[in-house]
Amino acid sequence: MPEEVHHGEEEVETFAFQAEIAQLMSLIINTFYSNKEIFLRELISNASDALDKIRYESLTDPSKLDSGKELKIDIIPSPQDRTLTLVDTGIGMTKADLINNLGTIAKSGTKAFMEALQAGADISMIGQFGVGFYSAYLVAEKVVVITKHNDDEQYAWESSAGGSFTVRADHGEPIGRGTKVILHLKEDQTEYLEERRVKEVVKKHSQFIGYPITLYLEKEREKEISDDEAEEEKGEEKKEEEDKEDDEKPKIEDVGSDEEDDSGKDKKKKTKKIKEKYIDQEELNKTKPIWTRNPDDITQEEYGEFYKSLTNDWEDHLAVKHFSVEGQLEFRALLFIPRRAPFDLFENKKKKNNIKLYVRRVFIMDSCDELIPEYLNFIRGVVDSEDLPLNISREMLQQSKILKVIRKNIVKKCLELFSELAEDKENYKKFYEAFSKNLKLGIHEDSTNRRRLSELLRYHTSQSGDEMTSLSEYVSRMKETQKSIYYITGESKEQVANSAFVERVRKRGFEVVYMTEPIDEYCVQQLKEFDGKSLVSVTKEGLELPEDEEEKKKMEESKAKFENLCKLMKEILDKKVEKVTISNRLVSSPCCIVTSTYGWTANMERIMKAQALRDNSTMGYMMAKKHLEINPDHPIVETLRQKAEADKNDKAVKDLVVLLFETALLSSGFSLEDPQTHSNRIYRMIKLGLGIDEDEVAAEEPSAAVPEEIPPLEGDEDASRMEEVD
């Protein structure tokens, strides 16, 4: 519970900062950061968001603006008090908002930002994590926030950090509606009271904010007045100064008197110059919205500044697309690709505010899901429509045909932008590292643009070395006899490159695409073909490699020769495999496990088993179909065939078949249901190899716990006793 202190009738409540926020503030206060100026950008950005909210509410309920029609941001430096004040006429905060938003409830980004900071990230990232307000403590020793929401009284929040803050009802000067942030600056931060410095920071970070930012400065100026006016003014001053004598008529000291002797002749009154104090108001962001200007007149620096003010990013954007659409529908858009993926790119619960929607230059909202598909959620920018109604609601947006057309155009322009970027290999590499998952998600979700998206994919292949290659480049290198694009999915480039599945394909000189991200499994389910060539997994049944007559004949002979062994192995393994066949894909491995054409690969099975909310019924039928393929040219398989032909009931044959199957499961990327039994078989093989007699070991250690004997195969489909092999 907060402490309550009573000052007369005024009630002051003290709250402790939530632990992570207190830690963050301590980090901000006690670490040296060179670019402290970003505090002003963050506070202006928060003010702009508050103004956006009240303007949006007023579109459906104009009475919300009765408490103040003008939407603006004022900056007021006061050198004598050493304070810098920011005032906005935004939505304001209720008492509950004040307590929750400024201290007691940690945002999801608080911890992530601290981790990023400690890993060496720049303090200027703070706004991207939703905790920009606390940057005020970079320059302030104490912060006071006075706020008034239409639904509540005026309240004041105050904190000098130190782990706690106070909230009280504020009976000072009424602010109507909005928020006033008063920063009591540290002694060494008074530069932010200087006109030049404030202007410089606002121009650098906030010149594209959509509301007027006005700087209020107390200045002195010389004023020229006539003698009569001077006397009146002096007279007024005299009344105010009680301690001065009132005998003589006041004389104004000459600052720069107009010494004209013949003034009488010219019938002109004498004039004097005096100094007076006045408040100078200067609007700092008169720039009209950048997206309304002609792209040819805008420099890359201006785009960069706008991008930074829009996103709170400290780095420049990677690429930009500025376009307008005219005709039946009219809108302008300015889209940016960032250099990095945000920390919460695929967090579903977080409302994305990456594209701001305007209607005729009036901001409507910044979390419009209908404006851009999920897979392009990293694109930042603005869209300004001439056709949508100003008072459009979220419900109307969902049904809006205009918005559907805008969305279609945005997707088209984004894909154009990616294709343009692909021509610059260095920058495309950065883009692909950050956003390849988005492109693959697009292939899974967006059937209309699947072909265009597939052209943007880049993969390592068996022939690409350290570089990544496009599917178009792969097709251009295909052999004349090759009809399909071969690929393999797995956990890493090293794992798939050494896989048994690629042995013969590579030996025959065919290129294999290595797909090593979990999302590739989903992507390739939808991407059935590219440029007229089907995509074929080398880990699934039915792999057809171009063969000449001699190879076909040899394959038929092998099938006939090993037919009985295949039948026997199927009997021994029973339900563990759907069938046992001769392989055309193995070279140096004795066997491998392949899956049916429509079943999951081993990699997909691994991914699905890792899902916390998996559907076990789907797991059942998708992972059941396994085929064991044996290599007819391998000595192990040949020896096994000979043993089986000599005595198909030989226990050693059964043991070896099970051991081969389980080893093939592992090398093919599957997991074992009973790894302990498999391990015990391997240990027994090692003992045999070392010539250790098991009976002797047991006799030497009579007190040792004897492990349960591994049951024979007949009684259990998972295990069999290992017989000594010649």
Curated annotation (Swiss-Prot):
GO biological process: negative regulation of proteasomal ubiquitin-dependent protein catabolic process; positive regulation of transforming growth factor beta receptor signaling pathway; regulation of cell cycle
Residues given in the record as ATP binding sites: 46, 88, 107, 133, 394
Gene Ontology CC: aryl hydrocarbon receptor complex; cytoplasm; dynein axonemal particle; extracellular region; melanosome; nucleus; plasma membrane
Interaction with NR3C1: annotated span: 9-231, 266-610
Phosphothreonine sites (modified residues): 299, 481
UniProt region (Disordered), positions on chain: 221-272, 697-726
Residue numbers of N6-malonyllysine PTMs: 401
Residues carrying Phosphotyrosine: 303, 307, 486
Chain positions found as Phosphoserine: 226, 257, 263, 309, 447, 671, 720
Comp. bias (Acidic residues): 225-246
Regulation (activators, inhibitors): In the resting state, through the dimerization of its C-terminal domain, HSP90 forms a homodimer which is defined as the open conformation. Upon ATP-binding, the N-terminal domain undergoes significant conformational changes and comes in contact to form an active closed conformation. After HSP90 finishes its chaperoning tasks of assisting the proper folding, stabilization and activation of client proteins under the active state, ATP molecule is hydrolyzed to ADP which then dissociates from HSP90 and directs the protein back to the resting state.
Residue numbers bearing the S-nitrosocysteine modification: 592
Residue numbers marked as site, Cleaved under oxidative stress: 126-127
Glycan-modified residues: 436, 454
Signal peptide, first to last residue: none
UniProt keyword list: Acetylation, ATP-binding, Cell membrane, Chaperone, Cytoplasm, Glycoprotein, Membrane, Methylation, Nucleotide-binding, Nucleus, Phosphoprotein, S-nitrosylation, Secreted, Stress response, Ubl conjugation
Cell compartments where the protein resides: Cytoplasm; Melanosome; Nucleus; Secreted
Positions occupied by motif TPR repeat-binding: 722-726
Free-text description of this protein's post-translational modifications in UniProt: Ubiquitinated in the presence of STUB1-UBE2D1 complex (in vitro).
Residues found modified as N6-succinyllysine: 219, 533, 579
Disulfide bonds: none
Database matches in CDD domains: HATPase_Hsp90-like
Subunit structure: Monomer. Homodimer. Forms a complex with CDK6 and CDC37. Interacts with UNC45A; binding to UNC45A involves 2 UNC45A monomers per HSP90AB1 dimer. Interacts with CHORDC1. Interacts with DNAJC7. Interacts with FKBP4. May interact with NWD1. Interacts with SGTA. Interacts with HSF1 in an ATP-dependent manner. Interacts with MET; the interaction suppresses MET kinase activity. Interacts with ERBB2 in an ATP-dependent manner; the interaction suppresses ERBB2 kinase activity. Interacts with HIF1A, KEAP1 and RHOBTB2. Interacts with STUB1 and SMAD3. Interacts with XPO1 and AHSA1. Interacts with BIRC2.
Record text about domains: The TPR repeat-binding motif mediates interaction with TPR repeat-containing proteins.
This protein's name: Heat shock protein HSP 90-beta
Organism of this sequence: Oryctolagus cuniculus (Rabbit)
Gene: HSP90AB1
